[in-house]
A protein has these predicted regions:
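Surface-exposed, low-hydrophobicity segments enriched in Gly/Pro/acidic/Ser residues
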Residues: 1-583
């Protein structure tokens, strides 16, 4: 195509025809496109990858608080990060999950209670609470204490150890499986560092693999506070054997009983937003798609998308914001600062009003090994923003108003996305008009051996490389390994210059992707050897594998129209004029 604004495709399978009528040439293409166009940007030996997502796209079913206590104290603990305002240290943990892999090593039966160790937030009112409202999580806080089974004050009997008789072993009326407790057989224990990571001070775990909705997650953990040891749940080596064997006087086995561990339930196989464990799933962590994050060349910003993306919010007309935010008007405060992600300088030292950049603090604002972004508020776009925008002068009623969806001003009603935390992701679509906060950024991945362009068996001739807008020459500035899908910069000056290098290419689609139909027609009329005009029509549409399209993967049907003209002529007087210029 004789145009720099519209580019054709290289990897096509179909029919091409070229017709000529006098000085008019018509080229038509009707084919299947078996490639995807993409581009990557590299700088200083590494690839710059971009990410963007809206706030509804939190990383669900992967990050969990260990107790309501840790959730309730999370905001306060990180109010003055990087200092963490608590003296808790989790020293031991076991994480158990539904065994989908049929693994036979490190497996146990368990019965898990959502109210185990809790005091202030109880799902079943029949649970007898003995600990104070602000007590640290501990087995002895209520009647579900596994160390007191069958004794005075216990609401459990020994029958709770047998999966077949769990319900009979619970003396609390109206105690329902799937809500108040879950029982599982042959569950597997996850390996710390390989299958999950633990934040030992803030009290949450991050799984490497997202759980399915019907999978169950439970834990036992031990921690210290000022030298005092607390424990929630039972460990596999706490003296509760996996099996009990009864033998008669003749030495014959008369009965074999499998003993279940009593654990703290973090996720049930039934999703119920009205149950306390719904709040244990963290909804303030987002996935960048990176395997490893480093502070070098990492950028992140938060935007509000209305007529155009801006990094601040403005008051609704006729309803000015109330109090300033830390001495500055809210409308003049960047969203990074407003959401407590910019209070440090590059060296992670506190700085008044921040430095304008995202605070990269491993374990607090990022989980580097998994490429996660972590907000320092449990509900940054919910309760936290509700409090920031409150202007009725009575902060004591905020909790009640927020829970009852009672807004005191139009700014709260416009910006607070409370349904994001009170309902499932799907149900949160009922307020999709509030899903306007967007997180954008970029990270630098290791350069390694060449620049990976995201595919294998790249069609020859489809790679285009530019440096700072200048088109590079293959074989002179770079080489391409089309089989491995890598570009190698051979100009040492370019490598050392840190000029952004953009690689655009097409990679052959793998089996099973949506079928793409590529149709195009290009008409050119040549008036003379110096003057050509043309018009182009291109259409690309996809046919999905199934009639039901996935969210964010909807089939496309895009059309491009273009017009171009090309005029060339020799201008000798310009050459003579340039020749007269002094050297």
């Amino acid at each position: 195509i004789n145009s720099s604004l519209i580019s054709g495709a290289q990897s096509l399978f179909g029919v091409k025809t070229q017709l000529k009528f006098g000085k008019t040439t018509i080229t038509g293409v009707f084919s299947d496109q078996r490639s995807d166009a993409r581009s990557v940007v590299a700088e200083g030996g590494g690839t710059l990858d971009q990410f963007e997502f809206f706030i509804r796209d939190y990383d669900e079913n992967r990050h969990f608080f260990l107790a309501q206590y840790f959730r309730n104290n999370y905001d306060q603990a990180l109010a003055n990060y990087p200092f963490i305002n608590n003296n808790i240290q989790i020293t031991r943990i076991e994480v158990w999950v539904t065994n989908r892999s049929n693994r036979t090593e490190n497996v146990r039966n368990f019965v898990a209670f959502q109210d185990l160790g809790e005091t202030s937030v109880i799902g079943n009112s029949g649970v007898a609470v003995s600990g104070g409202p602000n007590a640290f999580p501990d087995n002895g806080n209520n009647g579900l204490d596994p160390t007191n089974i069958g004794n005075a004050g216990s609401q459990l009997t020994e029958q709770v150890r047998d999966i077949a008789t769990v319900q009979n072993g619970i003396t609390i009326p109206g105690f329902n499986e799937g809500f108040d407790f879950a029982k599982q057989e042959n569950t597997r224990k996850l390996l710390e560092g390989q299958e999950y990571t633990l934040n030992t001070q803030l009290g949450y775990i991050s799984l490497n693999q997202r759980l399915n909705n019907d999978e169950v997650l439970a834990v036992a953990y031990q921690y210290t506070v000022g030298g005092q040891v607390f424990q929630v749940g039972e460990f596999a080596n706490d003296g509760i054997g996996a099996t009990d064997v009864d033998v008669n006087s003749q030495g014959q086995v008369t009965n074999v009983t499998n003993n279940a561990l009593v654990l703290k339930l973090l996720k049930s196989s039934i999703t119920s937003v009205s149950q306390p464990i719904w709040d244990l799933m963290m909804k303030n962590i987002y996935d960048t798609g990176a395997f490893q994050l480093t502070q070098e060349d990492f950028k992140l910003n938060i935007f509000y998308n209305e007529s155009a993306p801006v990094n601040y919010i403005t008051a609704v007309q006729g309803s000015p914001f109330g109090a300033d935010f830390e001495g500055n008007p809210i409308s003049e405060t960047t969203l990074l600062r407003l959401f407590n992600l910019d209070r440090l300088n590059y060296n992670n030292d506190p700085q008044a009003n921040g430095d304008g950049f995202f605070d990269f603090v491993p374990g607090i604002t990022v989980i580097p090994q998994n490429g996660k972004i972590v907000f320092t508020k449990v509900e940054p776009f919910g309760r936290y923003l509700f409090d920031i925008l409150d202007n009725d002068g009575n902060t004591g009623n905020n909790a009640t108003d927020y829970q009852a969806d009672t807004y005191t001003n139009p700014n709260q009603e416009k910006y607070v996305y409370d349904l994001l935390y009170k309902a499932t992701k799907t149900a949160a679509l009922d307020e999709v008009e509030k899903n306007k906060f967007q997180i954008k950024g970029r990270y630098k991945s290791s350069g390694g051996d060449g620049i990976p362009i995201g595919g294998f068996n790249v069609p020859r001739g489809s790679v285009r490389v530019t440096a700072g807008g200048r088109l590079l020459v293959e074989g002179q500035d770079y080489t391409v390994n089309y089989q491995l899908g890598r570009v190698y910069i051979i100009d040492e000056g370019l490598k050392a210059s840190n000029i952004p290098i953009e690689v655009s290419t097409e990679n052959n689609s793998i089996f099973g992707q949506q079928t793409k139909r590529y149709t195009g027609i290009n008409v050119e009329h040549q008036f003379n050897e110096n003057f050509v005009i043309g018009a182009t029509y291109l259409n690309l549409n996809e046919r999905p594998i199934t009639q039901k399209a996935n969210y964010n993967s909807e089939p496309i049907n895009n059309t491009i129209l273009g017009f171009n003209a090309n005029f060339s002529s020799e201008l000798p007087f310009l050459s003579r004029l340039v020749n007269k210029l002094p050297n």
